[in-house]
Amino acid sequence: MEKKNFSDIGKVEAIRQLFEVSPFKQKDGTAFLSGEKGGIVRTASRLWLEGIDFDLTYFPLKHLGYKCVVGTVGELYASLARPQSISVRLGISAKLDLPQVTELWNGICAAAEEHHISRADLDLIPSRNGLTISIVSTGLTSPEVSENRKSANSKDLICISGNVGGAFLGMSLLEAEKRKFEKAGDLTGTPDIEKYKMLVGAYLKPEINPDIVSELSDSDIIPSYGYLADRGLADMAKRLNRDSGLGVKLYSNQIPFEGNSFEAGKKLNIDPVAAAMNGGDDFRIVYVVPISKYETFRHDFQTFSIIGHLAKPEVGTVVVTPEGAELPLHAQGWKENE
């Protein structure tokens, strides 16, 4: 694609061209949500900042756009909502041209299509401090969810949709390769990236099953709570403890890991269990499932792992070691007594 600067064509024309290469129509005005009568509107939003949430040295723009959408629709799936629309605001720095922003937009549109989103709107804003990405996703929860959702109880199961810790290890590998490049000026071969491509992929392009809400409905399972575990399992446990008023027990030997997580952890001097607890960016959905639905859930959702259960309030939030010791969980942003 011919290099084009925004100063040459203007914002309005740039947005028109971006929509021209997307599956969405450019529309003005507010979004209209369609669904069953009595459905509840849910929104999820997230702001991504260059240098804080991503590094363009090694983050492909198309993957970045895809990941930003997944990060917001994941919050909707956690609340049992089906996404319908996204609103995108891009703060564009002077170093990015239109073809680069088109790559980013292509990733956004690819994720939106994959997650059955029917409407997208876009605005471009100048940025002095690097690329900024703001996405608001809106969806609907069916009336049956609010009508039939039961309160959580002690012994209810804590279930997660896939492996954890891999994204933090993948990011750490990329950072290590970046330091090599800055020191030597050459990344020829990059054997570590190829060897640990599943971990790197977990960070650069996390995926979520777009049909998870429908599959839960088909199995007649309504979780009492749902979370996107994007800031580590410890943070998720703290939120669940706060929201439910019940204790949370996670079992370290039940946490699912990517095959070579421990090999990579040894190389990086990072404990994969610590990465799972406090690393973040895994974008796994955690549901609290009634223990009465154990057999159905195990049969119908075999990609999920049961990593713990709710407990009496006085338990607080703990991780149970293979030896049976209960260790209190600590999470960034939470006071020690929370």
Predicted regions and their residues:
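Helix-biased detector of long, well-ordered alpha-helical tracts
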Residues: 1-338
